[in-house]
Amino acid sequence: MRLGYFTMPVHPIGRDWSQTLREDREAIILADRLGFYDAFVGEHLTDVCENVTNSMLFHATLIHDTKTIKLATGTTNLSQMHPAVIAVNAAMFDHLAQGRFIMGISAGALPSDSEAIGILDQDRNKIFAEAIDVILAIWERDPPYNIDFPDNRFKVAINQTAAPHLGVGAMAKPFQKPRPEIVGTVVAPFSPGVVLMGKRDFHPLSANFLLATHLKSHWINYAKGKAEAGQKADVKDWRVARTIFVADDDKTALRYGREDAKSPYRFYFEQMGAKMKRGNRLYVFKSHKEQPDEEITHDFIMDHCVFHGTVNKVVDQILAMREKTGDFGELVYAGMDWLDPG
């Protein structure tokens, strides 16, 4: 099983932006030295706690400070930029990283981001679906492209201004052939979007703040999509993220990983719980669909979403989870704020 790293990141309000960016870089450099396979970094335009505004730009600073770890957007929010821009930026990044690039994609879930760029009232999932079709077409086709899909707002063609003898009118293709690995973060239990991911050979990453009870539903839907495409799903393509704290003794693990008022794990899930409630998405923390919102307390979330303890205890928790989920290809460690860098 591979080990991966994912961070949104989430830092307390008021922390120095430059300092948190340095810490987030250092965490990935350490993950590279420890042999982690990949590192996913999220992005938001309008959240001071989640400090990375462009994950591709952030990762570009790490290319020459890391050796083997794959640098993954986690995610590039496809509703926030024209797909032609995303396609060529991703292609360039893939060349800069010499193939150490994974393209994580999503529609972008933060409403304030959408409001800032004037798309709050639009269907971001539809924009996402249209954008990825165009990105893939740009990578697959040659000039003049003439991309004009039905019911798709994005039309891409370079007919009037091309000058092939000058190199004008062509867009870059990725370093990896036929394209980089594409990964989608999955949050909702029983998400139908995972079926579509299977059909298109995109790979799922199950979110660390989803109850383990629901993880199996992601694999079932992914396998269904692969079968509908005439292919067999491979467990190596499924990533499962979890929130984990390991200490030398259970007392320290309980304090830092759960009980202490200053615990970065507690802060993280206070943030996530409040944001999910505000967005009417508390269902991600529910053990069953009919569970009342009142039962989704902070302690309930911590009890179900954080593995903490000594090495052996945490290993037992991971193995118990795997009994429910079945095999998966990568365990993705969720990064927290650095309350105590030691």
Predicted regions and their residues:
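N-terminal beta1-alpha1-beta2 module of alpha/beta enzyme domains
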Residues: M1-T73, R179-P180
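Conserved, mostly hydrophobic/aromatic
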Residues: L3, G35, E43, L62, ...
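Hydrophobic faces of well-ordered beta-strands that scaffold small-molecule active sites
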Residues: L3-Y5, A39-V41, L71-G74, F101-I105, ...
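Short, acidic/polar
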Residues: S18-L30, A188-V195, V314-M321
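Internal, glycine-rich beta/alpha segment that forms the wall or movable "lid"
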Residues: H82-R200, S217, E228
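An alpha-helical appendage that flanks or caps ligand/catalytic pockets
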Residues: N125-K173, T213-G326
